[in-house]
Amino acid sequence: MSAAPDAQDSTANDRFTVLIPARMASTRLPGKPLADLAGLPMVVRVAKRAVHSAADRVLVATDDARILQACAAHGVEAILTRADHASGSDRLAEACAQLGLADQHIVVNVQGDEPLIAPELIDAVAALLPARPEAGMGTAAHAIATLADYHNPQVVKVVLDARGLAQYFSRAPIPFARNPAEHGWCSAGAAPGMGTLAGHAPLRHIGIYSYRAGFLRQLTQLAPAPTETIEALEQLRALWHGHRIAVHLTAAAAGPGVDTPEDLERVRRLLL
């Protein structure tokens, strides 16, 4: 079964919890979770988008009391985790333990720097796991629209198999077109991947994940993959150890995330 575009979107058919990892120690934008976006801290704005999904519960998982207090001030549920976690997945695994989530309970990892996340996308990624029991994880992607994004190492690409499962994620331009002229990829501003390469269009990975709580705990106990370290992409750990990742294809590009001061100003303008 291959991944389907938005025409076949469905809401999650199993109960799930949204967890939003948040930490203050961003290297490119210190204090990012509490950055003001139209009168709300960014992590609060993310949570308030997520509550419009079908999730039973939306929580922020943080190691900082300031984030905890900001969430409480705006009616957002949050829990305090240890400060020594190596990744957001480790933080969420601790949160699952604190919450006593059963192994089969679905958890959706929504990044705390995605203030324009679509609730419908959260539902679609949650719905992957009941629909695709062979997959340990779910995520999302959309077709790349420009050559600049295709070649940008900050834009993570994903290649799928015929069943809509991820084969590989990379910062490199994949799939690489040996004869780009045959696919209309030559001119600046072209739209590679829109109906080209017989279903193997260049796809931009969207950083949202679903897992069952038991799988998340298992994943954090696995050794890091060499490819994970080389690419600095944590999801490659699952593929390295033989687990499958189902990918929801959406026709709509995700709203801009916030990694830099320039990103922050861009989102502020969008919220005016």
From Swiss-Prot:
Pathway: Nucleotide-sugar biosynthesis; CMP-3-deoxy-D-manno-octulosonate biosynthesis; CMP-3-deoxy-D-manno-octulosonate from 3-deoxy-D-manno-octulosonate and CTP: step 1/1; Bacterial outer membrane biogenesis; lipopolysaccharide biosynthesis
EC numbers on record: 2.7.7.38
Domain of life of the source: Bacteria
GO-annotated molecular function: 3-deoxy-manno-octulosonate cytidylyltransferase activity
Keywords attached to this entry: Cytoplasm, Lipopolysaccharide biosynthesis, Nucleotidyltransferase, Transferase
Root EC class: transferase
A cellular-component GO term for this protein: cytosol
Gene3D superfamilies: Spore Coat Polysaccharide Biosynthesis Protein SpsA, Chain A (3.90.550.10)
InterPro entries named in the record: Cytidylyl_trans, KdsB, Nucleotide-diphossugar_trans
Protein location: Cytoplasm
Pfam (any one): CTP_transf_3
GO biological process terms held by the UniProt record: CMP-keto-3-deoxy-D-manno-octulosonic acid biosynthetic process; lipopolysaccharide biosynthetic process
Keyword Zinc in record: no
Catalytic activity: 3-deoxy-alpha-D-manno-oct-2-ulosonate + CTP = CMP-3-deoxy-beta-D-manno-octulosonate + diphosphate
Coiled-coil intervals: none
Protein purpose: Activates KDO (a required 8-carbon sugar) for incorporation into bacterial lipopolysaccharide in Gram-negative bacteria.
Family the entry assigns: Belongs to the KdsB family.
Protein name: 3-deoxy-manno-octulosonate cytidylyltransferase
Source lineage: Bacteria, Pseudomonadati, Pseudomonadota, Betaproteobacteria, Burkholderiales
Gene: kdsB
